[in-house]
Amino acid sequence: IKNGAPFDILLAADAKTPAKAVAEGHGVAGTPFTYAVGKLVLWSSDANLVKNDVAAVLNSANVKHVAIANPKLAPYGEAAYQTLKSLGLEKAVEGKTVLGDNIGKTYQFVKTGNAEAGFIALSQCFKDGKFVSGSGYVIPQDLYSEIKQDAVLLKKGENNEGAKRFLKFLKESQEATAIRDAYGYGTARSRAELTERYC
């Protein structure tokens, strides 16, 4: 985008990047909004590994590697470390942590078995109200800062009516909300609702 790539819209994994795009003159002022709120999950490709006890998983002798996105680069990594701190489990992952450059690489570590478990985005392993494979536990949202994912209309799309309509669809459409919910995104929910719905 900084180098002039012909993109009309940016859908970011955080709120900072769209705000920065506007501040640097690449995004249209007044257009950033939160299109989704990400959820953090402790997930394993092993269908029997993860129950509802994060400490038991991380302290398990069977868990030699725990994948986490680099907290300096990825909001989900930052959320994972906040969760560990909130639960007093920082020492449980010492010597076990495998850092991914982004949440996609972190997911691949776990999916391929290079890490027995990992903190990833719920949307990576969840569809239509259930885990697609493996086992997971949705981390209660009160253990980490909300992962707001913002969208922004870029300057190159300022006169693109299709781009504006798409952003309006994301922001206002019940259909867009249903799609987000099906993949584990949405607006902030209470801990009780998350536990009842996803666990």
Language model: regions and residue ranges:
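Exported/periplasmic ABC-transporter solute-binding proteins
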Residues: 2-3, 14-15, 19-25, 36-38, ...
